[in-house]
Amino acid sequence: MTQAEIKLCSLLLQEHFGEIVEKIGVHLIRTGSQPLRVIAHDTGTSLDQVKKALCVLIQHNLVTYQVHKRGVVEYEAQCNRVLRMLRYPRYIYTAKTLYSDTGELIVEELLLNGKMTMSAVVKKVADRLTETMEDGKTMDYAEVSNTFVRLVDTHFVQRCPLVPATENSDTGPPPPAPTLVVSEKDMYLVPKLSLIGKGKRRRSSDEDATGEPKAKRPKQTTDNKEPIPDDGIYWQANLDRFHQHFRDQAIVSAVANRMDQTSSEIVRTMLRMSEVTTPSGAPFTQPLSSNEIFRSLPVGYNISKQVLDQYLTLLADDPLEFVGKSGDSGGGMYVINLHKALGSLATATLESVVQERFGSRCARIFRLVLQKKHLEQKQVEDFAMIPAKEAKDMLYKMLSENFISLQEIPKTPDHAPSRTFYLYTVNILSAARMLLHRCYKSVANLIERRQFETKENKRLLEKSQRVEAIIASMQATGAEEAQLQEIEEMITAPERQQLETLKRNVNKLDACEIQVDETIFLLESYIESTMKR
């Protein structure tokens, strides 16, 4: 665990959950697994606050616990899961593009709350969608429920591990902590619920003096009497499935850039056919026959079977080897080599970074060393057609930044420089790790800058929010246009300009965070894929 990762985890925990949770989370990341009282003692936090912080972290899958032989429960932080919080906007946006606003809100609620029952998610999302609709229109629970089922069917949402029924029925003393188990066959099994109803608006005409709707209290009392139909069955967002989707999108985009749109559509079809059957960490997709691929092509994609076979042959013969042929039955069996695809994407990312940092001539040398595997300095000068002095400077720059490495091969046992070959080479895995570390530092800097910008303009932001609240309440009571105009003028022209600048800067920083995270995702996927081999 590097310092850059710990710092980024600290910033993310503080931004999402506050100082106490951040303090406990970072302590566990630094020290490893620890029991409750040791955490309280080492952090100087009260036992009650530590318990609450751990509850929050466990609810969001950021901390796991383990019962040891002597009955001691130890808590361990999941640093990689904390870093995933950086990707929350991307998960939510993906759900929106695939399953519209309903899917977006379902995934958002699950990410914000960590774990929820299906009935609670459906009711909350229906209420939120009803809020945004015109007066008189409401969102039906059944519609939200259908979208939830579709998300489960495509494995974007999955069940949380449960306490087994046998553990609850034991007559002996309860264990210090429950053992959670997950059944593979039930992980994507949706309980049969008859959710009948419509979303409710938060503000309605029958609100009483306290501002609480009358319909709310009876609902709570009935909930106490009637058991919730899916009580105890909790759901969470399946982040690995989202990562699989991001990886597939990156592969399709790479094929489209290298070849053409038809090739990318064929690869997209192959990935879609095997998305649920292929495990997230598998190096290859399941083999698919040419006939199966032809039948599964999108409606309206008018290409003949012969043309499809030609495209598949082209893809299989391509030097990048994204698609491989694994047999001849069924018109030819084809697989997508996910490991090779991730390797190519990581290499392209490294090349792009070298070009941006050091210029096109350095990128030429980098690609040359990458292609030839091992080269002496003289060979680099000759092949790249760059003067000796410039080539030496460029090689040293990249060597000092760890983009390329130097390998010594001695002719004699004494390692004398005059009798040693010095070969330049590119270790993609090592370079990817170095770049990933820099990306973590970049994101931490972006978050700190955004927080600084917001803090510097805190007074102005508070004033703007107060004015907006006054205008909203006056509009609700039917105030005249002149009165509204007078309130709006409370914010002067220079202040308005300052707010616009702040908004523009924060939007830029947010966009940068998401773009850097895309690079982080590619590098992490490649490193993970390489380590599994």
Swiss-Prot record:
Q: Which Pfam families match?
A: HTH_9 (PF08221), POLR3C_WHD (PF22536), RNA_pol_Rpc82 (PF05645), RPC3_helical (PF20912)
- InterPro entries in the cross-refs: POLR3C_WHD (IPR055207), RNA_pol_III_RPC82-rel_HTH (IPR013197), RNA_pol_III_Rpc82_C (IPR008806), RPC3 (IPR039748), WH-like_DNA-bd_sf (IPR036388)
Q: Give GO MF terms, alphabetically.
A: single-stranded DNA binding
What is this protein called in UniProt?
DNA-directed RNA polymerase III subunit RPC3
Q: Which UniProt keywords apply?
A: Antiviral defense, DNA-binding, DNA-directed RNA polymerase, Immunity, Innate immunity, Nucleus, Phosphoprotein, Transcription
The record's family statement is:
Belongs to the eukaryotic RPC3/POLR3C RNA polymerase subunit family.
- Alphabetical GO biological process terms: defense response to virus; DNA-templated transcription; innate immune response; positive regulation of innate immune response; positive regulation of interferon-beta production
In this chain, the stretch annotated as Disordered covers 197-230
Major subcellular site: nucleus
Assembly, in brief, is: Component of the RNA polymerase III complex consisting of 17 subunits: a ten-subunit horseshoe-shaped catalytic core composed of POLR3A/RPC1, POLR3B/RPC2, POLR1C/RPAC1, POLR1D/RPAC2, POLR3K/RPC10, POLR2E/RPABC1, POLR2F/RPABC2, POLR2H/RPABC3, POLR2K/RPABC4 and POLR2L/RPABC5; a mobile stalk composed of two subunits POLR3H/RPC8 and CRCP/RPC9, protruding from the core and functioning primarily in transcription initiation; and additional subunits homologous to general transcription factors of the RNA polymerase II machinery, POLR3C/RPC3-POLR3F/RPC6-POLR3G/RPC7 heterotrimer required for transcription initiation and POLR3D/RPC4-POLR3E/RPC5 heterodimer involved in both transcription initiation and termination.
